[in-house]
Design a protein with these regions (language model features):
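Receiver (REC) domain switch/active-site residues of two-component response regulators
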Residues: 62, 214, 425
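Adenine nucleotide phosphate-binding catalytic loops in nucleotide-utilizing enzymes
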Residues: 229-236, 240, 250, 254, ...
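Alpha-helical segments flanking ligand/cofactor-binding loops in enzyme cores
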Residues: 31, 54-55, 184, 233, ...
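Short secondary-structure boundary segments
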Residues: 66-69, 198, 220, 431, ...
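Short, polar loop motifs at secondary-structure junctions
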Residues: 66-74, 144-147, 256-259, 284-286, ...
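N-terminal leader/targeting and accessory segments in enzymes
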Residues: 1-99, 103, 153, 259, ...
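ATP-dependent carboxylate-amine ligase
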Residues: 1-14, 22, 35-38, 44, ...
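Phosphate-binding loop of NTP-binding sites
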Residues: 10, 95-256, 260-276, 334-340, ...
Length: 510
């Protein structure tokens, strides 16, 4: 068992009686902290965790870590002294938390990949796992918006345990204590390859610090999360800073057709030249790409493509909908190329044709009358725009968009209404998670932006039903915003709801 002296804390403190105190864990939560755990008090937007010090100690905290800028009330200082609980003031508790978590949970899977970007993260991590599995690398798992997932049945017990810890509506990137605990658990359960999502908030709050990544990637950057970041410069630089966590001589994978690709290249060469990264760029618009997309021939449900990898040409097929899915697949291929020998490149290319659509990502369900229903997460304007543009290419009839926003989202998210109105022939407004707002209130916001949108009804189910009933042969319906999510939050409580189940139920009753 670890003691306080096992960590980086100075041993020459005047108060030496606590050096050998047993430590059983770490916690950010004063209510859930267990006996002999370290309480890490983090400053939030509205409160400082130091305010919960007494509660943490009463629940068993053996030590407190706080921000050195925190103002500690006299009664808290007296309480610490009375209980003989050490207090450590540090420059950044979240950085300290990551360092401490790495000591407490030291083991990690051998190959850890991290993907960041505005759109495509969940699809890329799933496609990467699929590709590894198809090539015979079976000890795989993913961690992100969809929780902890794996195609290996021997990890089902681990999957259930981890998802029990992180809950039904997990953060894209878990807090650093939970994340390191998951990595440690995964290692001891036999996971060798783990692909994880890195959100901008998770990067900014040092949740992904102290992780031994083998490859990190950037899919794309478009306007999002400006309530958190303020400006696109801050948002993009936060995304770029993921690569500062990547050890030297490891691999960077990125979309060279994205408008932020040049800025990322400059960042890598100017800010991190000493790291000597291996670079794998993919795209259509530069002959300097390590994965060059030469030719794309599309049909309704996929693409025949020609690509050049490290100066050698290959042909393959992708049975995925949407040209942006080609980019997602190329990113997955880039991750795989970062760890396989060159004599397995042909196998990797051959397996691309076996990749399947990710749940809730342009997932196709056919109606009885010949209309196509596509379910896509597309929870921000840029993702919705890409999905609708791709549907226009393959749709002979009308595009019917069932679109909405979550309660309390920023004005940029409200732009989804404008995007839907621009690209769809029929727009039916609904909600994603109404939280404490009514459907009428949320729909009214959208109709102010695009008055031509139809009211979808009191429930998301009703909006989907309206779309399916009006659809004819050759039409495409896009249902956006929920994707893989199996719950809607209403009045603070999660309510089971899954778009594919709703669609199938409605079709079965036609």
């Amino acid at each position: 068992m670890l003691t306080l002296s096992s960590f980086f804390f100075p041993k020459n403190s005047s108060n030496k009686c606590w050096h050998e105190n047993k430590i059983t864990g770490l916690s950010f939560n004063s209510k859930k902290i267990a006996q002999n755990e370290i309480f890490i008090a983090v400053k939030g937007q509205n409160t400082d965790g130091i305010a919960y010090t007494k509660e943490a100690i009463n629940n068993g905290a053996a030590a407190i870590i706080c921000d050195k800028r925190s103002i500690i009330p006299n009664d808290v200082l007296q309480f610490l002294e009375t209980k003989n609980i050490p207090l450590f003031k540090v420059k950044n508790p979240e950085i300290t938390a990551a360092k401490t978590a790495k000591i407490f949970y030291p083991k990690q899977p051998e190959f850890i990949f991290a993907i960041t970007g505005t759109n495509g993260k969940t699809t890329i991590l799933d496609l990467t796992e699929q590709l590894l599995n198809l090539m015979g690398y079976k000890e795989t798992a993913t961690l992100g918006t969809m929780g902890f997932q794996t195609r290996n049945t021997k990890f089902n017990k681990l999957k259930n345990k981890i998802n029990g810890i992180i809950g039904i509506n997990p953060l894209t990137t878990q807090d650093t204590i939970t994340l390191h605990k998951i990595l440690d658990m995964s290692y001891y359960s036999g996971v060798k390859y783990l692909i994880t999502e890195a959100s901008s908030d998770g990067i900014m709050r040092h949740r992904i610090d102290e992780i031994d990544f083998v490859s990190c990637g950037l899919s794309n950057i478009s306007e999002d999360h400006l309530i958190t970041h303020g400006t696109m410069k801050h948002y993009s630089n936060t995304k770029f800073s993921l690569f500062s966590r990547l050890p030297p001589n490891k691999t960077v994978v990125y979309n060279n057709d994205d408008k932020y690709a040049k800025k990322l290249s400059d960042y890598l060469h100017k800010k991190l030249p000493e790291k000597s990264f291996n670079i794998i760029k993919y795209g259509k618009n530069s002959s300097a790409n390590e994965i060059q997309i030469h030719q794309i021939k599309s049909n309704k449900y996929g693409y025949d493509i020609e690509i050049k990898i490290f100066d050698k040409n290959y042909k393959t097929r992708l049975n995925l909908t949407g040209e942006f899915q080609i980019y997602n697949a190329m990113h997955a291929l880039g991750f795989v190329l970062s760890i396989i020998p060159k004599n397995k490149i042909q196998l990797a290319v051959d397996m691309l044709k076996k990749l399947k659509t990710v749940d809730g990502r342009m997932e196709l369900i056919k109606t009885k009358n010949g209309a196509d229903v596509f379910i896509d997460y597309a929870h921000n304007p840029s993702a919705l725009e890409k999905a609708l543009i791709e549907l226009r290419k393959i749709t002979k009839g009308r595009i019917i968009s069932v679109t909405g926003i979550s309660s309390g989202k920023s004005e940029s998210r409200n732009e989804t209404a404008k995007i839907a109105g621009k690209y769809a022939d029929v727009v039916i407004f609904t909600y994603i998670s109404p939280r404490f707002e009514t459907a009428d209130a949320i729909i009214a916001k959208q109709q102010k932006i695009f008055p031509g949108g139809l009211h979808g009804g009191k429930t998301r189910y009703a909006a989907i039903k309206k779309a399916i009933k009006m659809a004819k042969k050759g039409d495409s319906i896009l249902i956006n915003g929920q994707g893989h999510e199996r719950f809607i939050v209403e009045y603070g409580k999660p309510k089971p709801f899954y778009d594919p189940d709703a669609v199938k139920d409605i079709i079965s009753k036609e």
